Amino acid sequence: MSLQPQAETLSFEAEVKQLLHLVAHSLYSNKEIFLRELISNSSDAADKLRYQALSDAALYENDADLKIWIDFDKDNRTITIRDNGIGMSREEVIENLGTIAKSGTRAFRELLAEKKAEDSQLIGQFGVGFYSAFIVADRVVVRTRRAGMKADQGVEWESTGEGEYTLKNIDKPTRGTEVVLHLKESEEEFLDPLRLRAIITKYSDHILLPIVMKKIKTSGADDEDKNETPEEEVVNRANALWVLPKDKIKDEEYKELYKHIAHDFEDPLAWVHNKVEGKLEYTTLLYIPARAPFDLWNREGQRGLKLYVKRIFIMDDAEHFMPMYLRFVKGIVDSNDLPLNISRELLQSNEVINKIKAGCVKRILSLLEDLAKNDKEKYASFWKAFGQVLKEGPAEDFANRDRIANLLRFASTHNDTDEQNVSLQDYISRMKPEQNKIYYIVADTYTSAKNSPLLEVFRKKDIEVLLMSDRVDEWLVAHLNEFEGKSLQSIAKGTLDLGDLEKEEKVETEKFEKDFDELLKQFKEVLGEKIKDVRITHRLTDSPTCVVFDENEMSGHLQRLLIQTGQDFMQAKPILEINPSHPLILRVKNESDKTRFNRWADLLLNQALLAEGEQLKDPASFVKGLNELLLDS
C-alpha cells in the first residue's frame, strides 16, 4: 500500500481557528478540564474498538486489555495521555483534528456571526474535546495508528494551536493514540502526580477503562530503585457508575458522567436513574440537557442513548430507545437480556427493545411531571429549550398523548407576555361555567396572534384564548383534538360557536342579516373568486372585517407553512366576515358610487388578510386604492 507524503503542513479550517481562540481565552479559569476531555476521548476510542472487535477480533492485535495511561516528564515539561483504543488513520486525523463536524460548521458560523452566544455556550454546543489541550500547552504532538493497519502506517500530528498543523507518517508498533502536551511555562502545577490524580478523581472516576499512572514513590525509597521500571497503579474506580445504588452516587458524579457521555460542557438540567429487575433486567440513567443542541431540528441527525450489554459497550446513538419527540434525551441503557452482537438492524424488531423503550419514555415523562409540579423554574428552562420538540409528542405517541398534553405550555390572553407558561389544566381551571371548549389561535408570530381581530369578542366576554405561534403548533392541534373531555377549537376556522355565552349576540346578528343581505351580495359580486363567502359576524367589536376559513379546510397559517416548504396543495379561499355595527361598514353600505364601492370592498378584504398574517399578492394596487379613497374622503 502506498503511503501519503512523509510530511506536509495543512491549515485549520476557519471554524477551528475560532474555536481554538475561544478555548485559549475563555476556559483559562477552568483549565484542568483539558485532562477530562482527553481522557474522555481515549475512553471513546476504547469503546469503538470493543464494538468493532465484536465482528473482527483481530483488531485487538493480541492485546484486549484496554487502558489509559497518564504520564508526565518534569524535565521536558510534558504530560502524555496514551490509550490502546481504536486509533486513527491519516484521513481520520485530518477530519477529527482539523475540522469541526460538517453538520456543525454552518451553525457555528451563524452563532459567531450573530455574536449573541456567550463563549461558554459556543464551547458547550460544539464541544471542547481535543482542542482543550491548548489551554495548558503551547505545542501538542499526537501519535496514532488505527487498529488493523500496519505498523508503518502510523501518523504524527503536531501544532502550536495557531493557524497550521503538520502531518507525517511514522512507525508505530502499537495501535491507539498518544497525546503529548508541551506545557506553557505557567502550567507547572500539572507536573505534580498528586494534582493529576486529584483531577482524575474529580472528573474521570466513572470512566469504565482503568486509568493508569506510575506509583508515587515513598520518601524512604532506595536510590538503587531509580533505574527500575516504575510500578503502575489504577487511579480511578473504573467501574460502571450506573450499576451502583443511587445512594452511593454523588450528584457531582452524575454530572461528570453526563458530560462524558453527552460531550457537553454544562451540567444537565435533570436526570433519572432506574434499575428494573424481574423477567426483564436492565438499568437506565437518563439525562435532560440544560441547553438545546445546535442540530435539535435535524431529525436525521445523530441521537439516542449509549447501549451497554452486561456493562460492555455496544454502540453510541442507539436511537430505538427514545421516540423522536424525546430526541434530546441523553443517557445509558445497560441490558442483561440482549445479545452482545446485536446490530442496529436487530434493534428495530426486538421485543426487548420495545419494552425498554416504553420504560425509558415512562421515566422521562415522570421526571418532567415532577419538574412541572415541584420545580417550576427548572421546568420553564426545560420548556424554553425543548418545548417545541415535546409538542411533536401527541402526534407520535398515542399511548402517552394525555400525559404529554399535561406537560404542554402555551402563551395566552390571560397573561400579557409571550412566555409559554399556561398549561391546559390552568386553562380549564379558568373556564367560564357555560364554556365547554378550549379556544386557540395559531398565527405566524405571538404579536400577530395577540393582536388578531378574531380575539375581540373573546376579550369582551373575558374568555381566555391560547396564543400559538410555533411552527409545530399546526401539527400539534391536528392530533390533539381534546383534553379532559374539552374539545380544542380554533377561533380562525368555521363559524363562531360560544354556546350559551353568545345568546345576545346571535339575536342581534339575526336582526342585521335581512338588512345587510343586499350588501353581502354586492361584496360577493365585486370580490368574486378571491373569497369563498361573505357573511355577517358578531365576533368583531372594534374591527370592520376579518377572514376565517371553513371548519374542514386548512387555516391561512398552515397554508403559508406549506407554501414555504414548497408543497403542492389546493389552496382554500378565505371567508370574509363583516361587522355590521362598524362605521366603515355602514359607510360602504350607503356608498352609491360603484367605483368607490369596489375600492372599499378590495380595501376591506386586503385589510382583513393583512391582519390574518397573509401577504398581499399585489401590494402596490392595495396602496394605490387606499390613497384614492383617502383623497376622496
From Swiss-Prot:
Name the Pfam families for this protein. Answer: HATPase_c_3, HSP90
Query: Does ATP-binding count among this protein's keywords?
Result: yes
**Listed InterPro entries:** HATPase_C_sf, Heat_shock_protein_90_CS, HSP90_C, Hsp90_fam, Hsp90_N, Ribosomal_Su5_D2-typ_SF
| Chaperone among keywords | yes
Region span, A: 1-344
SUPFAM superfamilies, A to Z: ATPase domain of HSP90 chaperone/DNA topoisomerase II/histidine kinase, HSP90 C-terminal domain, Ribosomal protein S5 domain 2-like
PROSITE patterns, per database record: HSP90 (PS00298)
Q: Which SMART domains match?
A: HATPase_c (SM00387)
Extract the ranges annotated as region (B).
345-560
Record localization: Cytoplasm
Any one Gene Ontology BP term: DNA damage response
Q: Show the segment(s) annotated as C.
A: 561-633
Q: Which GO terms describe its molecular function?
A: ATP binding; ATP hydrolysis activity; ATP-dependent protein folding chaperone; unfolded protein binding
Keywords assigned = ATP-binding, Chaperone, Cytoplasm, Nucleotide-binding, Stress response
Kindly list the GO CC terms recorded for this protein: cytosol
Family statement: Belongs to the heat shock protein 90 family.
Q: Describe the task this protein carries out.
A: Molecular chaperone. Has ATPase activity.
Assembly and interaction partners: Homodimer.
Q: What is this protein called?
A: Chaperone protein HtpG
Q: Which organism is it from?
A: Coxiella burnetii (strain RSA 493 / Nine Mile phase I)
| Lineage of origin | Bacteria, Pseudomonadati, Pseudomonadota, Gammaproteobacteria, Legionellales
Question: What gene does the UniProt entry assign to this protein?
Answer: htpG
